[in-house]
A protein has these predicted regions:
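Active-site neighborhood of HAD-like aspartate-dependent phosphohydrolases
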Residues: 1-46, 79
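Structured helix-beta-strand junction loops
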Residues: 47, 112-113, 137
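Hydrophobic alpha-helical core bundles mediating ligand binding, dimerization, or RNAP-core interactions
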Residues: 22-26, 30, 44-49, 69-70, ...
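Asp-based, Mg2+/Mn2+-dependent phosphohydrolase catalytic module
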Residues: 1-5, 104, 108, 119-230
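A metal-dependent, Asp-based hydrolase signature
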Residues: 38-88
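Alpha-helical elements of Rossmann-like donor-binding domains used by nucleotide-donor carbohydrate transfer enzymes
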Residues: 21-28, 43, 71-75, 89, ...
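Short, acidic loop-to-helix structural element flanking the phosphoryl-transfer center
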Residues: 62-70, 82-118, 128, 154
Length: 230
């Protein structure tokens, strides 16, 4: 059996805490009371997923995720809540997402034994900005933009494998979203589920149940590093 040589990481939700980041940015931009920002952020994220699902259903290929988030924000905000400039500024916060506390130390340990790369639906420019700002020590950055399709389309996983020069069995997908892992597993990739109970904030509906269908189930990146011998 081939030995895993590279790890691919989902970024939004798995490596970064978008919920807290966006809520804090929204309150900074609009300190006035009366807006339930946690609810807005949850519906905003759901609107993003709905837009990607619609794009896949209509075979529209890749769309700028920044533009998708910007449009989805207008859909969830009432008229008069934030100016156009403020909405533009808040959308840019998706490029300033903070990592979960375990991420940098966990990646640092994993990097001693594996090639580390992103495999994200977000734009390449956003990945670069997030990673540089947060000090995320990737060896490579792969994104849907490079494949022209969004996860879970098989083409995006194959694209990453081609760029890495590795067989699927030599690569492990790491994500907190099970649809992502199942798509990778169907192509022969290894899988590691990382539970993020606060992905949608306290009381959010994150799926954190471990499953035997995945090769590894971990509580965070440090636990993942421990289980992978780093």
């Amino acid at each position: 059996m081939p030995v895993v040589r590279a790890l691919l990481f989902d970024v939004q939700g798995t490596a970064t805490d978008f919920f807290s980041t966006l809520c804090e940015e929204a309150r900074r931009i609009s300190p006035a009371p009366g807006v339930d920002w946690p609810d807005v952020v949850r519906r905003w994220r759901a609107g993003y997923f709905a837009a990607l699902k619609d794009a896949r259903a209509h075979h529209n290929g890749w769309l700028s995720v920044h533009s998708v988030y910007r449009g989805a924000l207008d859909d969830v905000l009432e008229d008069g809540v934030l100016s156009v400039a403020q909405r533009d500024e808040l959308t840019l916060a998706w490029q300033r997402l903070r990592p979960w506390p375990d991420v940098v130390p966990g990646l640092t340990r994993l990097k001693t034994a594996f090639t580390l790369a992103t495999l994200s639906n977000t734009d390449v420019s956003a990945l670069v900005n997030i990673s540089k700002r947060a000090g995320l020590p990737w060896d490579a950055v792969f994104a849907a933009e490079m494949a022209g399709v969004f996860k879970p389309d098989p083409a995006i996983y194959r694209m990453a494998g081609t760029y890495l020069g590795l067989e699927p069995a030599e690569i492990m997908m790491v994500a907190s979203h099970k649809y992502d892992l199942r798509a990778a597993a169907a192509l022969g990739f290894g899988t590691a589920f990382v539970a993020r109970p606060l992905e949608f904030g306290p009381g959010g509906a994150a799926d954190v149940a471990y499953s035997a269908e995945f090769d590894v189930n971990a509580s965070d990146f440090l636990d993942l590093a421990e289980q992978l011998g780093c």
